[in-house]
């Protein structure tokens, strides 16, 4: 009897030791209750992945039926590059059972993701385009090559885009929606970002194709799982259309540091896309947030008109480049314009710059961030501890 009891305890301990880790959230207040993201181990086949999801669905249905709870379970599935996984709403018993699966690498609490904009200031000057095309500050003219991002696709993963805005000249199209059933930009943030990437008047790359991928609602809020779904869709869409090496992604959003979000954007880079990410607006080390903390993406801090770090901008060794991010004029839904500040406004300068250089120099998208850093001007005053002082520049010689 003693032997059997000891053996049972040993097996239970071994099972617990081999269970997939449920990662602790870095910002507990942002956790979405009972919502999780599950990431599979490398090498899990498509067939095994399908069988695992079927097992989870059956098991969870049984658990919830027993408690008279419905409308839970798997909500989104991810399958791109080396990342296979899913997200959904699960009870505690189901998550415990999932963690025991030998196919699961780790589990993460889903959490809220927000915009990285700050404020709107009416009638602010347009200075960003002039700054990124001149070696000295103070020039308002934008000097650029007429290739202007022609043939490059830009995935604007945000609040949606007003694709009918005349300043997009018909180059903006709707891609996918991972947050609600409203295929419009009810917030305005995504339209502003898209305008900086590639609109006729305010865009860095004035001939780029803009693809709206909605992951945040009209309040500017969404979930980590929704953002990952948007990245998943964008990467697969670019690969299916054979444009991954001539495609860019912009992510002017952020949340708590997340292994799953960082894995998703790293997969996008591995697929060949140029990924520009806002550093964040907390005046702290960007190492603490995602996707800004992922080393393989192009993480962008914000500068002001005086070539200084914007007071709100995050900083740190993960920052690759500075770009204009204070009082940036761009598009608003309904055919108008608006002025916004934030690293949300800096990142699309780098998405647009990536598109511009891909078309101009015929480089691959995966080489764009390094090229942007090579061209950068060492002019930022007080960039922050351990942070580059390089400001983006398009290299036209002016």
Swiss-Prot record:
The active site is at 158 (charge relay system), 189 (charge relay system), 344 (charge relay system). Gene3D superfamilies: Peptidase S8 propeptide/proteinase inhibitor I9, Peptidase S8/S53 domain. Residues 1-19 form the signal peptide. The keyword Hydrolase applies. PANTHER family: ALKALINE PROTEASE 1-RELATED, PEPTIDASE S8. Belongs to the peptidase S8 family. This is Subtilisin-like protease CPC735_015300. It comes from Coccidioides posadasii (strain C735) (Valley fever fungus).
């Amino acid at each position: 009897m003693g032997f059997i009891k000891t053996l049972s305890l040993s097996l239970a301990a071994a099972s617990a030791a081999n269970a997939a880790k449920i990662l602790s959230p870095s910002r507990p207040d942002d956790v979405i209750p009972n919502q999780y993201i599950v990431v599979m181990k490398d090498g899990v086949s498509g067939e095994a992945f399908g069988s695992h999801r079927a097992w989870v669905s059956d098991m969870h249905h049984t658990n919830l039926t027993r408690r008279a709870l419905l409308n839970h379970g798997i909500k989104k599935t991810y399958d791109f590059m080396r990342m296979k996984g899913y997200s959904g709403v699960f009870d505690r018993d189901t998550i415990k059972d999932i963690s025991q699966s030998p196919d699961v690498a780790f589990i993460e609490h889903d959490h809220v993701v927000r915009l990285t904009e700050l404020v709107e200031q009416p009638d602010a000057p347009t200075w960003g385009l002039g700054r990124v095309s001149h070696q000295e500050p103070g020039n308002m003219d934008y000097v650029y090559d007429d290739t202007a991002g022609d043939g490059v696709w830009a995935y604007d993963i945000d609040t949606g885009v007003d694709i009918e805005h005349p300043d997009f000249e018909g180059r903006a199209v709707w891609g996918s929606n991972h947050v609600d059933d409203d295929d419009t930009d009810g917030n305005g943030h995504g339209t502003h970002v898209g305008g900086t990437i590639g609109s006729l008047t305010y865009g860095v790359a004035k001939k780029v194709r803009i693809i709206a991928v909605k992951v945040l609602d009209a309040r500017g809020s969404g979930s980590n799982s929704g953002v990952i779904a948007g990245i998943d869709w964008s990467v697969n869409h670019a690969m299916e259309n054979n444009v991954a090496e001539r495609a860019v992604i912009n992510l002017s959003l952020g949340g708590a540091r997340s292994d799953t979000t960082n894995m998703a954007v790293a997969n996008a880079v591995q697929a060949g896309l140029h990924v520009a990410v806002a550093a964040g607006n907390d005046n702290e080390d960007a190492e603490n947030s995602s996707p800004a903390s992922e080393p393989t993406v192009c993480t962008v801090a914000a500068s002001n008109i005086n070539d200084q770090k914007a007071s709100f901008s995050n900083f740190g060794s993960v920052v690759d480049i500075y770009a204009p991010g204070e009082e940036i004029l761009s598009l608003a839904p309904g055919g108008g314009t608006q002025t916004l500040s934030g690293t949300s406004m800096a990142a699309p300068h780098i998405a647009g710059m990536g598109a511009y250089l891909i078309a101009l120099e015929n480089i691959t998208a995966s080489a764009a961030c390094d090229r942007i850093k090579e061209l950068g001007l060492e002019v930022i005053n007080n960039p922050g501890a351990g942070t580059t002082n390089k400001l983006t520049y398009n290299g036209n010689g002016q």
